[in-house]
């Protein structure tokens, strides 16, 4: 026990977590030269391509320290992106220590702070590491003072290293051994193991990544999952040295995997406690809070015959992604599909991309929306995540929208444009602090303003230097209305959006104009209208294509021409009564791309 160290690496995106993990694995001989590749722990193609970590991964390393002892180091690599912050808290709850990696040239950024506070809340020992000191722009002293200023962690003994060149890696390992406490736990007590993560493997079923707190777990033991009371025979236990290696047993303080022939992922819930059926623990370990999706969007197959395939694909994805939620829904415009819940926009983007890549699906996505609280006239409260499900205008007393608290870090010179952007998005400033060259802005913003395109806009007004972290605060009453779009007098449910009354006229006009350009011309006039309730606020007309019926009259009598024109008019009128308009895929995406106040 004294020679085990469990630690994870936390940092802002692109501060070098995965590279540092590579170096530590290489230094401790976890993989041979041939198997070593960059970002070993990012196993998904998508993770590699975007250069982000999505799933937390682990590696068990052996390190002979300068005091001559051999230590077992369990490394858990965590994602840095705000959408995956729950992955971070899960990883941290399995550790006693965390390496706080800060890019010496960038200083402290938003996720650095958020993740570090998560670590401190869980009583994890934080070891600051200044990375990228080989860069000419590196300024370790400034980074040190920012860590002390902003986070309040003592950084006088921060380790300097460069994960790219391998400089200072030994010092990092020594710091882990010296400063991270050994795990506490009793190998003789009844087994308690926390499930940190679980995923589905095609050959062995569900693989659970666990941290053993008390007791010992061996193959052939019957295990009991405490939240569902289900029992399974344990087939295999082991550790990842990124590759999986089977072991005789996992004992208190260790992190490893358990395979127990479980077929469905729902059975192995993350945050659940595993114990032995023969000698169960009295009470489970404190788990994690359930993750609630923040952003909803409809996913529909382009070919309606692929509906079943889409359902299977979503179910397979959910095996690896506990946060994804979906339920079937029907849209008059798009047919059968699913309403999916995501943690944020990046998560939505990634799920969509994985469906298209790994499962070959062609998808139509509707505009992302957040969950609104609607107070009905009789006082009942319902939650609405789909604009089409909003009750009619007289049926409810008020709509409340989710408000988030956003923390934005940015260099001083971009404060003006960022404040302007936040005000455009109906934000209210709570606080503003200066830390050296960096400014920390704290704003309250309505979540549906953030969902659309806030992140992209923030990056563009600050040239990519601003970083954002947000958390849900509360539901607050607002003057919101449902904007319907009608094509040829028919409501298109998939194009409805919920907007603030102040920007409704503008949005309505913009959307109608956009759709006019996207819907192909028909043989008859098509009206594109934006409406709030029964009140039409904007209209555009798609002009009909017409044949020149007078081409065959050379000269001739005016009454003859009139007769032909009248006949054409009659025909168009009849077509208009029976004609229906095909709406192209681009039209659904247009809803996403209407810019607020240009």
Curated annotation (Swiss-Prot):
Organism domain of life: Bacteria
List residues binding GTP. Answer: 14-19, 131-134
Say what the protein does.
Required for accurate and efficient protein synthesis under certain stress conditions. May act as a fidelity factor of the translation reaction, by catalyzing a one-codon backward translocation of tRNAs on improperly translocated ribosomes. Back-translocation proceeds from a post-translocation (POST) complex to a pre-translocation (PRE) complex, thus giving elongation factor G a second chance to translocate the tRNAs correctly. Binds to ribosomes in a GTP-dependent manner.
Q: Where are the transmembrane segments?
A: none
**Taxonomic lineage per UniProt?**
Bacteria, Pseudomonadati, Pseudomonadota, Betaproteobacteria, Rhodocyclales
Q: What is the protein named?
A: Elongation factor 4
Q: Where in the cell is it found?
A: Cell inner membrane
Q: Where is the tr-type G domain?
A: 2-184
* Database matches in NCBIfam families: lepA, small_GTP
Do the record's keywords include Cell membrane? yes
For this protein, what is the EC number? Answer: 3.6.5.n1
Q: Origin organism of this chain? A: Azoarcus sp. (strain BH72)
Q: Which family does it belong to?
A: Belongs to the TRAFAC class translation factor GTPase superfamily. Classic translation factor GTPase family. LepA subfamily.
SUPFAM superfamilies in alphabetical order: EF-G C-terminal domain-like, P-loop containing nucleoside triphosphate hydrolases, Translation proteins
Task: Specify the protein's topology with respect to the membrane.
Answer: Peripheral membrane protein
Cite the CDD domains for this sequence. Answer: EF4_II, EF4_III, LepA, lepA_C
Q: Which gene encodes it?
A: lepA
Q: One biological-process term from Gene Ontology?
A: positive regulation of translation
Recorded hits in InterPro entries, A to Z, give: EF-4 (IPR006297), EFG_III/V (IPR035647), EFG_V-like (IPR000640), EFTu-like_2 (IPR004161), G_TR_CS (IPR031157), LepA_C_sf (IPR038363), LepA_CTD (IPR013842), LepA_IV (IPR035654)
Provide the primary localization. Answer: membrane
Q: Does the keyword S-adenosyl-L-methionine apply?
A: no
Per its record, what are the GO molecular function terms?
Answer: GTP binding; GTPase activity; guanosine tetraphosphate binding; ribosome binding; translation elongation factor activity
Q: Which UniProt keywords apply?
A: Cell inner membrane, Cell membrane, GTP-binding, Hydrolase, Membrane, Nucleotide-binding, Protein biosynthesis
């Amino acid at each position: 026990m004294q020679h085990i160290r469990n630690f994870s690496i936390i940092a802002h995106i692109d501060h070098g977590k995965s590279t540092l993990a590579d170096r530590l694995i290489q230094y401790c001989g976890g993989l041979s030269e041939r198997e070593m590749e960059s970002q070993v722990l990012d196993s998904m193609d998508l993770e590699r391509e975007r250069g982000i970590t999505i799933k937390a991964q682990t590696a068990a390393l052996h390190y002979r320290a300068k005091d001559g002892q051999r230590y077992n180091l369990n490394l858990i690599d965590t994602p840095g992106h705000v959408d995956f912050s729950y992955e971070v808290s899960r990883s941290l709850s399995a550790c006693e220590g965390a390496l706080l990696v800060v890019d010496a040239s960038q200083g402290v950024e938003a996720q650095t702070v958020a993740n570090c506070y998560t670590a401190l809340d869980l009583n994890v020992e934080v070891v600051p590491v200044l990375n990228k000191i080989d860069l000419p722009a590196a300024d370790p002293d400034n980074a040190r003072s920012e860590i002390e200023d902003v986070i309040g962690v003592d950084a006088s003994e921060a380790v300097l290293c460069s994960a790219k060149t391998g400089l200072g890696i030994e010092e990092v390992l020594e710091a882990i051994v010296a400063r991270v406490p050994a795990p506490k736990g009793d190998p003789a007590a009844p087994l308690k193991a926390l499930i940190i993560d679980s995923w589905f493997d095609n050959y062995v079923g569900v693989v659970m990544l666990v941290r053993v707190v008390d007791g010992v777990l061996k193959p052939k033991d019957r295990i009991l999952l405490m939240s569902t009371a289900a029992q399974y025979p344990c087939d295999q236990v082991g550790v990842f040295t990124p590759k999986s290696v089977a072991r005789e047993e996992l004992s208190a303080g260790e992190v490893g995997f358990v395979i127990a022939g479980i077929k469905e992922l729902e059975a192995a819930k993350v945050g659940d406690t595993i114990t032995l059926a023969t000698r169960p623990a009295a009470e489970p370990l404190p788990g994690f809070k359930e993750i609630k999706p923040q952003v909803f969007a409809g996913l529909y197959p382009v070919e309606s015959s692929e509906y079943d395939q889409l359902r299977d694909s979503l179910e397979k994805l959910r095996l690896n992604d506990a946060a994804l939620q979906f339920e079937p829904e029907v849209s008059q415009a798009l047919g059968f599909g699913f309403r999916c819940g995501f943690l944020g926009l990046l998560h939505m983007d990634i799920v969509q991309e994985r469906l298209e890549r790994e499962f070959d699906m062609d998808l139509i996505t509707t505009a992302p929306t957040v969950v609104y609280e609607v107070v009905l006239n009789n006082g009942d409260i319902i939650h609405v995540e789909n604009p089409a499900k909003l009750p009619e205008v007289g049926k409810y007393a008020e709509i409340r929208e989710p408000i988030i608290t956003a923390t934005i870090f940015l260099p001083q010179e971009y404060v003006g444009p960022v404040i302007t952007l936040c005000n455009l998005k109906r934000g209210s400033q709570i606080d503003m602090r200066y830390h050296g060259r960096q400014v920390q802005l704290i704003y309250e913003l309505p979540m549906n303003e953030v969902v659309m395109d806030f992140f992209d806009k923030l990056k563009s007004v600050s040239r990519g230097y601003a970083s954002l972290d947000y958390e849900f605060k509360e539901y607050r009453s607002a003057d919101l209305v449902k904007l319907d779009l009608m094509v040829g007098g028919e409501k298109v449910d998939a194009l409805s959006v919920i907007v603030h009354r102040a920007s409704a006229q503008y949005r309505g006009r913009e959307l109608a104009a956009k759709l006019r350009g996207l819907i192909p011309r028909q043989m008859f006039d098509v009206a594109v209208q934006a409406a709030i309730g029964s009140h039409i606020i904007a209209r555009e007309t798609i002009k009909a294509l017409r044949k020149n019926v007078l081409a065959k009259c050379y000269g001739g009598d005016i009454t003859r021409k009139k007769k032909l024109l009248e006949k054409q008019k009659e025909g168009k009128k009849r077509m208009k009564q029976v004609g229906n308009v095909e709406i192209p895929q681009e039209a659904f995406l247009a809803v996403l791309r209407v810019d607020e106040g240009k």
